Amino acid sequence: MSKKLENIRNIGICAHIDAGKTTTTERILYYTGKSHKIGEVHEGGATMDWMEQEQERGITITSAATTCRWQDKQINIIDTPGHVDFTIEVERSLRVLDGAVAVFDGVAGVEPQSETVWRQADKYNVPRMCFVNKMDRMGADFYRCVDMIKDRLGAKPLVIQLPIGIEENFKGVVDLVKMQAVVWKDESLGAEYSYQEIPDDMKAKAEEYRANLLDMVVELDDKIMEKYLSGEEVTEEEIKKLIRKGTISAAFYPVLCGSAFKNKGVQPLLDAVVDYLPSPIDIATVKGVEVSTGEEKDFPISVSEPFSALAFKIMNDPFVGSLTFIRVYSGKITSGTTVINTVKNKREKIGRMLLMHANNREDVKEASAGDIVALAGLKDTTTTGDTLSDEDKKVILERMEFPEPVIELAVEPKSKVDQEKMGLALSRLAAEDPSFRTSTDQETGQTVIKGMGELHLEIIIDRMRREFKVEANIGAPQVAYRETITKACEIDYTHKKQSGGAGQFARVKIIFEPLKDVKDLKEEDKNKSFIFESKIVGGAVPKEYIPGVEKGLNNIRETGVIAGYPMIDFKATLIDGAFHDVDSSVLAFEIAAKAAFREGMPKGNPKLLEPIMKVEVITPDEYMGDVIGDLNSRRGQVQGMEPRGNAQVIKAYVPLAEMFGYVNTLRSLSQGRAQYSMVFNHYDQVPTQVADTIKAKK
């Protein structure tokens, strides 16, 4: 697979749900010769949508990576989901892409999720171009859509095509670079098209938009600008070179149009991907940390450098088992070699390497910088966001940041058989998706699943039922409360047991204090929620018994004294004690420590804590008052506001308990135009009247 880096395009196709993204990808695969029959999403037959739920719901959930060829270039396409609960997938794919095509619905224009995806692409500085789709639909308006890209996204559109005819009369586009019309023949499934004269009724408009295009691109090159201003002709080659330069530097975003469903506009879109979107060489470097020095630096993207790759997706394939998708940033890799997972410091042997075409696979022996391949048979240790690297030159590529899950549900298997299958299913699903977590509630023994939203967990449960055949009962969403103490207290407790044979004896004297009151906290202890220290001198408690005290406290603190929630943010210091030569043991000290905790904690003025979320709402100006009013009614504290593009970002701290159902409220407050994200920030005391209600429920 050795090839020139400049001939590779790693692109994503991203958009709002239903803008026609999967259909566009399908057409690309058809015209590049990878699909023999065009899959239609509304028939449930699209090649990219290969999980059962996707074919039923007609939405794309898993970003499938596909390789195809156009004009001797290799295009790796990542199809990304457009639903807000799956933004983790979008983030993850944007991280490994070099460029993107944003698909817009020609009727609806820029929709809320288009804004979210656009802002995520801004975060990773992904160069992109726009494809205004569905030009054949009733109410399609290309020019309105271009205005919305300008106003709603605050982006600079560079129109390089104009539609010929609208709605059912849409038959082609005017290419403003070549200044010719491109018209498709209906009967050839869009495979045949011809260049023609621009229709008379469009000549004036084409001239006007061509002048705008030239005004924008010549700004990027002083020589060509002089030539243009002196009235000389700017060549097609020069225009293309400048459009490429401006696209890669995000000076503007080329806008094309078409109707993927009606097979019009796809080939020029492919030409534009090749002509204007970057190759790995244009991106040049990737950020990372050199393991030996801990220094952060930019590593060159090149085949001659040592091997490094980022695992960006793990997927279960019914035929091959677990697949790890990697983007190779530097060097090359062949099957049979051993590399190191630098995040986990574990070796991995490379077995089968596959090039994926949506649902078909092709075995390859080698992958090099710029490639996106799937590895079969890696150990379970490699998870999303890990780096695989050369053992001699270890690097950790920039970690992807995954949001904390914000909603949790209890799931209970219906039978013993289901219980075993559920454990396996959940661990597999969590390996695929870092925004999904599972844990076991120590008290109730229930399994708790946590995710990014209700649809996210719904799909997880659905996959558990279908792929792993697990039947389970589902509980209502819950909040994870905690407890702590607010003042220091000292306890002297003696545990004695004498009942024939060997007895038990242990005495401990412990000081419990809130972490915030501890002076001279060591650096490594600053992020801990519980610290144990022994200040025993002179052997009052022999060394070998002290771990028993720590173990007892660690176990018992999982069940607090107010409502049974785990105790956090306190320090326990063992200052004195006593032992018996025969009757003392590690177990006796463990029991004594637990009893000291139960007796001491109520004296430390314990309080209930709740998770406080950092909430960011991005809303158009006109809904700002309503959004802030609603956040205040949820015990929220608004921290500030800042403009972003033409919207306002409201930052606030809000208790998680008040955020259930927020997505629906926000939708109705803003007619679906506002979006929000929230991440866990800190724990804070629960107000007394709220705490009383929680205690009563327990």
Swiss-Prot record:
NCBIfam families hit by this protein: EF-G (TIGR00484), PRK12740.1-5 (NF009381), small_GTP (TIGR00231)
GO molecular function: GTP binding; GTPase activity; translation elongation factor activity
Signal peptide (residue range): none
InterPro entries, per database record: EF-G-like_DII (IPR053905), EFG_II (IPR041095), EFG_III (IPR009022), EFG_III/V (IPR035647), EFG_IV (IPR047872), EFG_V (IPR035649), EFG_V-like (IPR000640), G_TR_CS (IPR031157)
Domain tr-type G: 6-281
Biological source species: Rickettsia bellii (strain RML369-C)
Residues binding GTP, per UniProt: 15-22, 79-83, 133-136
GO cellular component: cytoplasm
Cell compartments where the protein resides: Cytoplasm
Name listed for the protein in its UniProt record: Elongation factor G
Stored PANTHER family: RIBOSOME-RELEASING FACTOR 2, MITOCHONDRIAL (PTHR43261:SF1), TRANSLATION ELONGATION FACTOR G-RELATED (PTHR43261)
Protein's GO biological process: ribosome disassembly
Main localisation: cytoplasm
Function (record text): Catalyzes the GTP-dependent ribosomal translocation step during translation elongation. During this step, the ribosome changes from the pre-translocational (PRE) to the post-translocational (POST) state as the newly formed A-site-bound peptidyl-tRNA and P-site-bound deacylated tRNA move to the P and E sites, respectively. Catalyzes the coordinated movement of the two tRNA molecules, the mRNA and conformational changes in the ribosome.
Gene3D superfamilies: 3.30.230.10, 3.30.70.240, Elongation Factor G (Translational Gtpase), domain 3, P-loop containing nucleotide triphosphate hydrolases, Translation factors
PROSITE patterns assigned to the protein according to its UniProt record, in alphabetical order: G_TR_1, G_TR_2
Domain of life: Bacteria
Pfam family, one: EF-G_D2
